[in-house]
């Protein structure tokens, strides 16, 4: 039941953010391949698990970013549903948004190809062993942690749109 509540809350935040018309900050001054190399392990695992439902190859940044809001929402929900550490959870949608913003600026075929190769390698090397699995001794703490992740990732998604 609590998981459904988290999903509904996150989806509501994303829907509200989609209606917002405020300007967002420009992406960082990092290159597209540089951003692809900074994708946290947790986000890479999510991309590996989500790319087929999005309809793109995992390293096809242009395809993944065609529906930026949907990609950010799906990555955010995946991160919230996993046991990612707080830092990865809070930066997950920022890095995806920044990559898609740079793709939208059409940096050229060579840059996109390079970034796609980097992202493909990052996703291929991502492991689930670094992601904490819940145990009976930490379950209560994880509930509070999950609530914090919902708020942080939801806020990041709201800014991304």
UniProtKB/Swiss-Prot annotation:
GO terms for cellular component: external side of plasma membrane; extracellular region. Residues 24-126 form the CFEM domain. Disruption phenotype: Decreases virulence in maize stalks. No sensitivity to Congo Red (cell wall disrupting agent) or sodium dodecyl sulfate (SDS) (membrane disrupting agent), and in vitro cell population growth appears normal. Residues 1-23 form the signal peptide. One of its GO terms (biological process) is effector-mediated suppression of host innate immune response. InterPro entries: Extracellular_membr_CFEM_dom. Keywords: Disulfide bond, Glycoprotein, GPI-anchor, Heme, Iron, Lipoprotein, Membrane, Metal-binding, Secreted, Signal. GO terms for molecular function: metal ion binding. Disulfide bonds join 46-78, 56-63, 65-100. Suppresses host programmed cell death during infection by binding to Z.mays WAK17 isoform 2 and Z.mays LRR5, to prevent activation of Z.mays WAK17 isoform 1 and the downstream hypersensitive response. Interacts with Z.mays LRR5; the interaction is direct. Interacts with Z.mays WAK17 isoform 2; the interaction is direct. This is Effector CFEM5. It comes from Gibberella zeae (strain ATCC MYA-4620 / CBS 123657 / FGSC 9075 / NRRL 31084 / PH-1). The lineage of its organism: Eukaryota, Fungi, Dikarya, Ascomycota, Pezizomycotina.
């Amino acid at each position: 039941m609590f998981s459904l509540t988290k999903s509904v809350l996150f989806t509501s935040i994303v829907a509200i953010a989609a209606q917002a018309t405020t300007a967002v900050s420009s992406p960082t001054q990092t290159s597209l391949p540089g951003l692809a190399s900074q994708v946290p392990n947790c986000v890479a695992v999510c991309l590996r698990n989500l790319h087929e439902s999005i309809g793109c190859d995992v390293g096809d940044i242009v395809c993944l970013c065609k529906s930026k809001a949907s990609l950010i929402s799906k990555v955010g929900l995946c991160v919230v549903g996993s046991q990612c550490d707080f830092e990865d959870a809070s930066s997950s949608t920022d890095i995806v948004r920044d990559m898609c913003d740079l793709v939208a600026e059409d940096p050229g075929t060579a840059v996109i190809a390079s970034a796609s190769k980097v992202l493909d390698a990052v996703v291929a090397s991502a492991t689930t062993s670094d992601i904490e699995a819940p145990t009976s001794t930490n379950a209560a703490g994880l509930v509070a942690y999950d609530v914090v992740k919902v708020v942080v990732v939801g806020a990041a998604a709201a800014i991304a749109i």
